[in-house]
């Protein structure tokens, strides 16, 4: 598995929200240096942090599902972040929901990086490296093993793109195996899926052992 990607200093310059949590439309501009976000209860401080975390982890650090983050009465949410890595400026956006003109359409999550549509998740995760500390993080220590594995997967996915790819491969193969067992497949198909599971599983286990001796 490849070495950790080189993480350069990242500066977030702006954040735009549409139908995210309680924000129908909001735009924020950030300066450089240490930034404090203040406001009354319910003003949206945590929403800002959650949106930034979402562009980093591709999921909520508050353990919320994507559909739970869509503003009530809306069919989608959209987050756009402007940031720089060194002297290079970038824009990253995440959109989740369905076509408002087709209420029966499936919920879809899409990523865009520097104006390029249909960007893969593997190309996005870790672009904006963040560390989140909140009361919910006690779950990592006091919670069950699943919480610790989830945290470890997020951290390793940001550091090692190949780990994230192996994790996606494993989850995809696991889903295929579950579906195949329901339809009574032939042994050859199951054997092929099991080989894919084993290959991805070895890569995941190897990197976890390296990270936590």
Model segments located where?
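Phosphate-binding site recognition
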Residues: 53, 67-70, 188, 195
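An accessory alpha-helical subdomain
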Residues: 139-213
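Pre-Walker A-like glycine/lysine-rich segment at the N-terminus of P-loop NTPase domains
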Residues: 1-54
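Regular, well-ordered alpha-helical segments
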Residues: 54-57, 179
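Nucleotide-state sensing region of NTPase/ATPase domains
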Residues: 57-147, 156-159, 163
């Amino acid at each position: 598995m490849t070495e950790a990607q080189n993480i350069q200093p990242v500066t977030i310059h702006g954040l735009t929200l549409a139908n995210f949590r309680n924000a129908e439309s909001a735009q924020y501009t950030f300066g450089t240096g240490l930034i404090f976000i203040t406001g009354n209860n319910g003003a949206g401080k945590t929403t800002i942090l959650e949106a930034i975390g979402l562009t980093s982890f591709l999921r909520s650090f508050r353990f919320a599902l994507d559909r739970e983050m869509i503003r009530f009465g809306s069919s989608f949410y959209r987050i756009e972040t402007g940031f720089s890595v060194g002297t290079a400026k970038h824009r990253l956006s995440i959109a989740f929901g369905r076509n408002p003109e087709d209420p029966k359409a499936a919920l879809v999550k899409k990523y865009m990086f520097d104006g390029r549509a249909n960007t893969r998740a593997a190309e996005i995760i870790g672009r904006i490296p963040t560390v989140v500390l909140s009361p919910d993080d006690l779950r990592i220590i006091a919670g069950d093993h699943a919480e610790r594995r989830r945290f470890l997967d997020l951290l390793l996915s940001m550091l090692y793109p190949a780990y994230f790819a192996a994790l996606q491969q494993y989850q995809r193969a696991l889903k295929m195996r579950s579906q195949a067992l329901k339809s009574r497949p032939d042994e050859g198909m199951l054997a092929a899926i099991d080989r894919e599971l084993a290959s991805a599983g070895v890569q995941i286990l190897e990197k976890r052992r390296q990270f936590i001796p």
